C-alpha cells in the first residue's frame, strides 16, 4: 500500500499522504490514486532539472511505476508529454536506468559507489551517519523497518512524514 510520498525542492518540503483525516505537515489524499496524481502534478509544477534520492530508481521509481500501471495512471513527470521509461537491472554490476523527458535522475547510491568515499555499507542510515553525522528517523532494517513504517502510518503519521523528509 502506498502510504506517503515526500519531496524536497530547495526550501519547499511537501508530503502527500494517503489519509482522509487531516495530517499536520502533509497534503491529505483520499486514496493511492490521489497521492500519485498530486505528486506527479507537483513535480511538473516545480519543474526540477534533477530528481535525486537514495536508491531512487531501483526502489522509489520502480515502485511508483508499478503502482501507476496498476492504477492506470500515466507514469509521466517529464517536461514533455509521455511515459517515463524505467529499466531495472537485476545485475549488481549494471545500473538501472530511467528516462524522464527534460530531467536527469541521479541516484545517490550509484553515485556513492563510484566516488572515493569509503563507507561500512551502502544502507541509507549508515551513509547518512557517516556523511551527515546523523541517521534516518527509523533505524530498523529489513522486515523490522517495514513494521516500524507501518506502525508510524497507523499511529503516528507525523513521524512517517518526518522520516520521509529527513
Where do the PLM segments sit?
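Acidic, metal-coordinating catalytic cores used for nucleic-acid/nucleotide bond scission
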Residues: 52-61
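Short, flexible loop/turn elements at secondary-structure junctions
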Residues: 9, 57, 110-112
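Active-site-proximal helix-loop-helix substrate-binding element of RNase H-like nuclease domains
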Residues: 15, 22-30, 47, 61, ...
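Structural beta-strand/beta-sheet cores of well-ordered domains, especially the beta-sheet scaffolds
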Residues: 3, 52, 102-104
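Conserved RNase H-like, two-metal-ion catalytic cores of nucleic-acid enzymes
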Residues: 1-50
Amino acid at each position: 500500500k502506498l502510504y506517503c510520498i515526500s519531496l524536497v525542492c530547495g526550501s519547499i518540503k511537501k508530503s502527500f499522504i494517503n489519509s482522509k483525516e487531516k495530517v499536520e505537515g502533509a497534503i491529505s489524499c483520499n486514496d493511492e490514486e490521489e497521492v500519485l496524481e498530486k505528486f506527479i502534478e507537483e513535480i511538473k509544477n516545480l519543474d526540477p532539472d534533477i530528481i535525486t534520492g537514495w536508491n531512487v530508481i531501483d526502489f522509489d521509481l520502480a515502485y511508483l511505476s508499478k503502482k501507476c500501471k496498476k492504477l492506470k495512471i500515466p507514469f509521466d513527470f517529464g517536461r514533455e508529454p509521455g511515459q517515463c521509461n524505467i529499466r531495472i537491472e537485476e545485475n549488481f554490476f549494471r545500473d538501472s536506468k530511467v528516462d524522464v523527458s527534460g530531467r536527469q535522475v541521479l541516484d545517490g547510491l550509484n553515485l556513492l559507489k563510484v566516488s572515493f568515499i569509503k563507507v561500512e555499507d551502502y544502507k541509507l542510515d549508515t551513509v547518512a551517519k557517516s556523511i551527515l553525522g546523523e541517521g534516518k528517523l527509523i533505524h530498523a532494517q529489513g522486515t523490522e523497518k517495514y513494521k516500524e513504517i507501518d506502525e508510524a502510518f497507523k499511529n503516528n503519521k507525523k513521524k512517517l512524514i518526518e522520516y520521509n523528509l529527513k
